[in-house]
């Protein structure tokens, strides 16, 4: 009632019309509950059902971890990566695509392309991309580019290609690091080529960087079927790392049963 009085004082014309309508039609302010059913009062009206539409098409964009850091790669680089992968089975079309699209990339885009190809284990395409980079005016010999490619080839059991890059790297007066030596030695031992593994080992001893422990551990384990070669590596290991121990297998300690 207080609100009605305040309203009537502020809006006298509106209030007079409003009260006249109430007096003429008293039914508008009366609410009848007699016609309502108990079921309606006790149970609320359920909401109308709705349908959710789920898209079942693929929009063609790369999904998931395949394109990690995709936002950091430019559109031109993404286009080149997709084109290289699409044409990798056709050498003629691939060479044409490289001439028309890859060579016009900027430096950062080229580096992004080779990095993404290596991450996706497209080593053959990464090597082609590396050959393009070597022809650029801004290219300088980079041991890390060689390292990534050689390690990828060694893990893929493509030792001939790995050693071809190895020789190119040495011609540019670059030296592998411990991880590169380790993966190449492990690759040759896995392929059953202990002589090639020992050649890489001898090259490691001549490196200007001091050798690390891991390549020796890989050789000591992989040369168990070749005791003469293993004893030589073990002797060098004990001289270079006197505080370390080269553990022999039980049959060498206690003798064969």
Swiss-Prot record:
Name its cellular compartments. Plastid, Chloroplast
| Molecular function (Gene Ontology), one example | zinc ion binding
Q: Name one GO cellular component term.
A: chloroplast
TM region(s), chain numbering = none
Outcome (variant: residue 104 to E): Abolished RNA binding
Q: Which NCBIfam families match?
A: PPR (TIGR00756)
Q: Quote the annotated effect of residue 206 to E.
A: Reduced RNA binding
Phenotype when changing residue 96 to E? Reduced RNA binding
Q: Identify its protein family.
A: Belongs to the PPR family. P subfamily.
Q: What task does this protein carry out? A: Binds weakly to specific single strand RNA (ssRNA).
For this protein, the record's InterPro entries field holds: Pentatricopeptide_rpt, THA8L-like, TPR-like_helical_dom_sf
Transit peptide located at 1-55
PANTHER family per record:
PROTEIN THYLAKOID ASSEMBLY 8-LIKE, CHLOROPLASTIC
UniProt xrefs under Pfam families: PPR_2
Name of the protein this chain belongs to: Protein THYLAKOID ASSEMBLY 8-like, chloroplastic
Sorted alphabetically, the keyword list is:
Chloroplast, Plastid, Repeat, RNA-binding, Transit peptide
- What does the UniProt entry list as the effect of changing residue 157 to E? Reduced RNA binding
Provide the effect of residue 186 to E: Reduced RNA binding
User: PPR repeat ranges?
Assistant: 142-176, 177-211
Q: Which organism is it from?
A: Arabidopsis thaliana (Mouse-ear cress)
């Amino acid at each position: 009632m207080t609100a009605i009085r305040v309203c009537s004082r502020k809006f006298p014309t509106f209030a007079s019309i409003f009260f006249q309508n109430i007096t003429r039609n008293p039914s508008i302010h009366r609410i009848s509950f007699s016609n309502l059913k108990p079921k309606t009062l006790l149970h609320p009206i359920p909401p109308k059902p709705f349908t959710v539409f789920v898209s079942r098409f693929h929009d063609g964009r790369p999904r998931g971890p395949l394109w990690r850091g995709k936002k950091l790669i430019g559109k031109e680089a993404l286009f080149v990566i997709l084109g290289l992968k699409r044409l990798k089975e056709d050498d003629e079309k691939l060479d044409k695509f490289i001439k028309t699209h890859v060579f016009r990339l900027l430096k950062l885009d080229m580096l992004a392309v080779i990095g993404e190809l290596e991450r996706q284990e497209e080593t053959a395409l990464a090597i082609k991309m590396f050959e393009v980079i070597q022809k650029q005016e801004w290219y300088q010999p980079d041991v890390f580019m060689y390292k990534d490619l050689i390690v990828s080839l060694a893990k893929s059991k493509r030792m001939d290609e790995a050693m071809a890059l190895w020789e190119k790297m040495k011609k540019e007066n670059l030296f592998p690091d411990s991880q590169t030596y380790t993966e190449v030695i492990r690759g040759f031992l896995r392929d059953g080529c202990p002589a090639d593994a020992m050649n890489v080992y001898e090259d490691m001893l001549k490196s200007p960087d001091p050798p690390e422990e891991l390549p020796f551990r890989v050789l000591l384990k992989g040369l168990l079927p070749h005791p003469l070669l293993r004893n030589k590596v073990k002797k060098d290991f004990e001289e270079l790392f006197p505080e370390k121990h080269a553990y022999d297998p039980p049959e060498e300690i206690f003798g064969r049963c």
